[in-house]
Amino acid sequence: MKIAIINMGNNVINFKTVPSSETIYLFKVISEMGLNVDIISLKNGVYTKSFDEVDVNDYDRLIVVNSSINFFGGKPNLAILSAQKFMAKYKSKIYYLFTDIRLPFSQSWPNVKNRPWAYLYTEEELLIKSPIKVISQGINLDIAKAAHKKVDNVIEFEYFPIEQYKIHMNDFQLSKPTKKTLDVIYGGSFRSGQRESKMVEFLFDTGLNIEFFGNAREKQFKNPKYPWTKAPVFTGKIPMNMVSEKNSQAIAALIIGDKNYNDNFITLRVWETMASDAVMLIDEEFDTKHRIINDARFYVNNRAELIDRVNELKHSDVLRKEMLSIQHDILNKTRAKKAEWQDAFKKAIDL
């Protein structure tokens, strides 16, 4: 049994970008199941084999990590085009890991055929005809189906908690107690403004010492419907393998979502935050059923509640340590089900 894993739109090299990191982590966790797996990308590397040097049909399974189909500046994107050519050659079912609601599977050919450089490719080279099974990180498969309604060859949908991969790796560790330099920390991107109202509500004008890391920038927050006076400190991107350590600098770390994530996707960021030395505080709308933690103290409805909860944690080390103990206990109980998670993954890819 041989498995190939690719990222549909990003070159996989190292841990400097989220898409590359995610693909490498998935490769590692699949390898740790005792399965024979290769990452295929643009070039041979420490973790990868080149698209040009392997035959996709030598593999019994092809797993694809979701990505957008964007040709920035109207120019060819070799990562996308090489990945889709690779997929188009495959003669068996393709397994699409749907970890981001914004990144459903799509064909590149409709986006290519009218470009000035379209003569470099043919429809036969790029059009993917194999049946596709979407493995959805979101539990609401109706949302996953709606995201793929325009794709004819997506024929199956199955829920699987993909995001747990990081905590099920052999070298996973909880963060150590860390000196606090921040009240609250949040990591993420602007996501085209889909979470702007939530970000402004919880992170701006709080009077707290808040850091916002990731590729969002203060100047993006300009929607007049969500006015603000004082922004958090924006500090830029960090490597994916540093997120829990970064979160640990704060007393609390915030989890928010948007309408397609609420009560649907539990994200990787949840587990990274739960593993940190920061108390995880969750927007109530993100998890109204308290699937993540069945304890109302971990949930906040608005800015005022966030401020109150953080101040409670600042003034009571007993409370802070109690809540940390609870979240770490829940994470460890989830990790104890590693064998079940591995079996469910194998079932999702029809092994």
Swiss-Prot record:
Keywords: Glycosyltransferase, Host-virus interaction, Inhibition of host innate immune response by virus, Restriction-modification system evasion by virus, Transferase, Viral immunoevasion. Pathway: Genetic information processing; DNA modification. GO terms for biological process: DNA modification; symbiont-mediated evasion of host restriction-modification system; symbiont-mediated suppression of host innate immune response. Its EC number is 2.4.1.27. It catalyses: Transfers a beta-D-glucosyl residue from UDP-alpha-D-glucose to a hydroxymethylcytosine residue in DNA. It is an enzyme of class 2 (transferase). InterPro entries: Phage_Bgt. GO terms for molecular function: DNA beta-glucosyltransferase activity. The keyword Hydrolase does not apply. Catalyzes the transfer of glucose from uridine diphosphoglucose to 5-hydroxymethyl cytosine of T4 DNA to yield glucosyl 5-hydroxymethyl cytosine (glc-HMC). This DNA process seems to occur immediately after DNA synthesis since the DNA alpha-glucosyltransferase interacts with the clamp protein gp45. The glc-HMC modification protects the phage genome against its own nucleases and the host restriction endonuclease system. The glc-HMC modification also protects against the host CRISPR-Cas9 defense system. Monomer. This is DNA beta-glucosyltransferase. It comes from Enterobacteria phage T4 (Bacteriophage T4).
